[in-house]
Amino acid sequence: MTITPQQLIALLPLLIVGLTVVVVMLSIAWRRNHFLNATLSVLGLNAALVSLWFVGQNGAMDVTPMIRVDGYAMLYTGLVLLASLATCTFAYPWLEGYKDNKEEFYLLVLIAALGGILLAGANHLAALFLGIELISLPLFGLVGYAFRQKRSLEASIKYTILSAAASSFLLFGMALVYANSGNLSFLALGKSLADNTLHEPLLLAGLGLMIVGLGFKLSLVPFHLWTPDVYQGAPAPVSTFLATASKIAIFGVVMRLFLYMPVGNSEAVRVVLGLIAFASIIFGNLMALSQTNIKRLLGYSSISHLGYLLVALIALQSGEMSMEAVGVYLAGYLFSSLGAFGVVSLMSSPYRGPDADSLFSYRGLFWHRPILSAVMTVMMLSLAGIPMTLGFIGKFYVLAVGVHAHLWWLVAAVVVGSAIGLYYYLRVAVSLYLSAPEQLNRDAPSNWQYSAGGIVVLISALLVLVLGIWPQPLISIVQLATPLM
C-alpha cells in the first residue's frame, strides 16, 4: 500500500500528536523541566488544531481501510484536542505543588488525545477498539496520579479493573458480530446487516455485549457505578479530561457505528437503548440531588447528560437532525464542563492534598472572587439547560429530535430530568452567594484570571453565553461536519 501526500495531510492531527509524544518522551529522558515539557505538549496540541484547516482543504477520504477522515472526524478531533489542551492548561498550576514526577502527566494526556483522534476517524471495529484502549490505558495512570492520596489510588484501581472487564465484553461482542457477518468495517457490516439478519441470536448477543462495553465507557446506567468514585478520586484536571475528551470521542464513534450499521431498525436494540437512556436520565439526576461533593455531583450529572445524548442516538434513523443535535449538544457540554471543572482545578491548585471539591469550600466565594463565581454560575445554568446559554440550545435540539421521532416517553424523561437537574445545579450556584465562612479552607489565587487556566475558563464562559444567544456559527460548523456515507 502506498501513501499519497493527500493521505498524509489527512492524517496530520494524528501524526503531529504522535510526534509530540515522542518529543516529550525524549525531552523527559534528556532533562526534567516541568515548564519545557508542558510548553512542548501545548504547542503540539495547538499545531494539531491548526492542522485541521489543512485537512479541511484536502477533502474527505478513506486514508486506510480503518480510518476515514471527513467533516465529522474533523469536528470530533477538534473537540478532543480542545479538551486535551484545557486539561494540560489546568494541570500546570496543579502540578506546581506536586512533589513527585510531574512531566509524565502530559505524556499520558497526549497518548489519550491520540486515542481520541483515532476514534473520531474510526471506520472499522479494530480502530474503534484500539482508540478506546488508547484513551483508557493512560487514564489508569492519570486517575491515580495523586497516588499519595488514598482516594486517588482507590479510584485508579476501580477504574482499571472495571475498564478491563468492560473491554473484554466489547471484544467478545465484536468477535460474535464478526462470526455472524465476516466483516469488521462499519460499512461492510451495515451492508451485511440488512434488515433480514437483525434477528439472529448470535448477532443480537454480539451487539448486546458491545452495548455493555460501550455503556461502561460512556458511564450509562447500569454500567455507571465507577463514575462518581473515579471523578471524586481523580485530580481535578484528570476529571476534566474524563468528563469531556473521553466521553466525546467514544460517543462520536458510537454515533458513526450506528449510522453505518442500521442497528436502530431492530426493535429489540431500540428498546434496550431506550431503557438505558431513561434509566440514565432519571437515576443520574436523582443521585446528584444529595451530593455535597462538586466532582461527585458533576459525575452523576454526566450520566444524565449521556442519557440525553442517547435519545438523539435512538432517533438517528428518523432524520438528519440527530447528527446536528449531538454535535451542538456535545459542544455545549464540552465548554460547560471545561468551565465547571476549570473552576474546581483553579481552586485546587497548586496540589496540596485533596482537591477543593466539597460544596462547603465554595460558600461565599462571590464575596472575594466575584468573577470566578460568575463563571461557575454561568456553567451551572448551562449544564441545567437554562435559556441564553449554550446548554439550552443543545437540550432544545434533543427535545426536538425526540418529538420528531415520536419518542414520547423519552421526551418526558428529558423534561423531568431537566427539572430535577435544575435543583442541584442551582444549589451549587446559590452557595456561591451565601455569607462566607469565618476561615477559608481553600481559595483560588488572587490573580487567577491572568493564568492560562483562568483564561481558558473565561473563554469557555464567554463561548457558552455568546453561542447561547447566537448559536448560528456553531450550528453551521456542525452542519458541515457530515460523515461521508
From Swiss-Prot:
One of the GO biological process terms: ATP synthesis coupled electron transport
Alphabetical list of InterPro entries matching this protein: NADH-Q_OxRdtase_suN/2, ND/Mrp_TM
Enzyme Commission code(s) on record: 7.1.1.-
Record-level GO cellular component terms: plasma membrane
Keyword vocabulary terms for this entry: Cell inner membrane, Cell membrane, Membrane, NAD, Quinone, Translocase, Transmembrane, Transmembrane helix, Transport, Ubiquinone
Endoplasmic reticulum in keyword set: no
Primary residence: membrane
Signal peptide residues on this chain, from the entry's feature table: none
Reaction(s) catalysed (UniProt annotation): a quinone + NADH + 5 H(+)(in) = a quinol + NAD(+) + 4 H(+)(out)
Transmembrane segments: 8-28, 35-55, 75-95, 105-125, 127-147, 159-179, 203-223, 235-255, 271-291, 297-317, 326-346, 374-394, 408-430, 455-475
Membrane disposition: Multi-pass membrane protein
Function in brief: NDH-1 shuttles electrons from NADH, via FMN and iron-sulfur (Fe-S) centers, to quinones in the respiratory chain. The immediate electron acceptor for the enzyme in this species is believed to be ubiquinone. Couples the redox reaction to proton translocation (for every two electrons transferred, four hydrogen ions are translocated across the cytoplasmic membrane), and thus conserves the redox energy in a proton gradient.
Cross-referenced PANTHER family: NADH DEHYDROGENASE
Family membership noted in the UniProt record: Belongs to the complex I subunit 2 family.
The protein's assembly and partners: NDH-1 is composed of 13 different subunits. Subunits NuoA, H, J, K, L, M, N constitute the membrane sector of the complex.
Record's protein name: NADH-quinone oxidoreductase subunit N
Organism: Klebsiella pneumoniae (strain 342)
